[in-house]
Amino acid sequence: YSEEDLIEIIEFAKSINFEFASYMSASKFYKDYALKTNDKSKYLEDYNQHVAIVALYLADGNKEQAKQFILAMIEQRYQPATPTFLNAGRARRGELVSCFLLEVDDSLNSINFIDSTAKQLSKIGGGVAINLSKLRARGEAIKGIKGVAKGVLPVAKALEGGFSYADQLGQRPGAGAVYLNIFHYDVEEFLDTKKVNADEDLRLSTISTGLIVPSKFFDLAKEGKDFYMFAPHTVKQEYGVTLDDIDIEKYYDELVANPNVLKKKKDAREMLNMIAQTQLQSGYPYLMFKDNANKVHANSNIGQIK
């Protein structure tokens, strides 16, 4: 852009009348989005100026396109995602994308790597969801010694602390979610972390939780049957495939019948009630319907959604 272009675009943005719809919306903008001095004692821009800077960045040198973006944002016809609206056009900024998906393998090296990666992504303003379904369950064996695995909860707690610590320069808090397959042995403990009366040492108070739910679970609930939760490490030992990657529709009955696979059972409808009660108390867990997502997966040739 030339200097004349910049002046013209800024004046165009200032000429459009904008009023916040509520005190809450004005407070949200000036608290979380407006550029401030380093000591945060003064604001350096108003809403129209902020929109102009975002539009200039997105238009990438196209003056008329920048004006169209400004008009669309001020008229509330278009709203960029939070990281884009916060960071576009700034020299000292995070990334412009919203979400990152990670997966933990069943090893301490992987746990440490994902913990570090999640902090780095949180630092640049990303929301991070992490699949914990490959981790061995509480009480499983490590190097043949039974009863020593700690399960998924300590990992979830460590990640929660990381997201609280690594925010975006105090401008935007870290946001993370941990997901677990509903057939995982630790799923009941995982649900308990969001109950209002959960022990503070176990409660996940700031990180979000979600369940990955294959259609097989709903089939069992519909038929009024028990469903089994399996210890992932014993599944991997028997079949060479992780619980998260195995075709549960195909192998479920075989897993139930295999005496070498550690498992426990619960009425499927009771589990649905448990999920509903936890959601009523906390709003969690999120539910990801795995098979439905994969039926309409546009990039199924690359791999499955899990």
What are these regions (language model features)?
Residues Y1-K306:
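Extended catalytic cores of very large enzyme megasubunits
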